[in-house]
């Protein structure tokens, strides 16, 4: 990633874009590897689960 030759404002925008992409990827990975397993752990049997818009959780009895 050589920055020489780029305009003054260009490198700033590039850096912000890269940071934004990394944050989005981290958020997606956090969602899939941390949040989804937690949602699934809440209910072990199908009859104990309530599913709403694709997110399942333990029925509140």
From Swiss-Prot:
- Quaternary structure annotation from Swiss-Prot or TrEMBL: Homomultimer; disulfide-linked.
How would you describe the post-translational modification of this protein? Not glycosylated.
Q: What is one term from the GO cellular component aspect held by the record? A: virion membrane
What are the inducing conditions?
Answer: Expressed in the late phase of the viral replicative cycle.
The family note in this entry says: Belongs to the asfivirus inner membrane protein p12 family.
Q: Which UniProt keywords apply?
A: Disulfide bond, Late protein, Membrane, Transmembrane, Transmembrane helix, Viral envelope protein, Virion
* Localization of this protein: Virion membrane
Q: What is its main location?
A: virion
Does the keyword Transmembrane helix belong to this entry?
Answer: yes
* Keyword Transmembrane helix attributed: yes
Q: What membrane topology does the UniProt entry give?
A: Single-pass membrane protein
Q: What is this protein called?
A: Inner membrane protein p12
Which parts of the chain span the membrane according to its record?
16-36
């Amino acid at each position: 990633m050589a920055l020489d030759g780029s305009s003054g404002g260009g490198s700033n925008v590039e850096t912000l874009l890269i940071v934004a992409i990394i944050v989005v990827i981290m958020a997606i990975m956090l969602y899939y590897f941390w949040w989804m397993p937690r949602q699934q752990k809440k209910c072990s049997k199908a009859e104990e689960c309530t599913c709403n818009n694709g997110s399942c959780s333990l029925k509140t009895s």
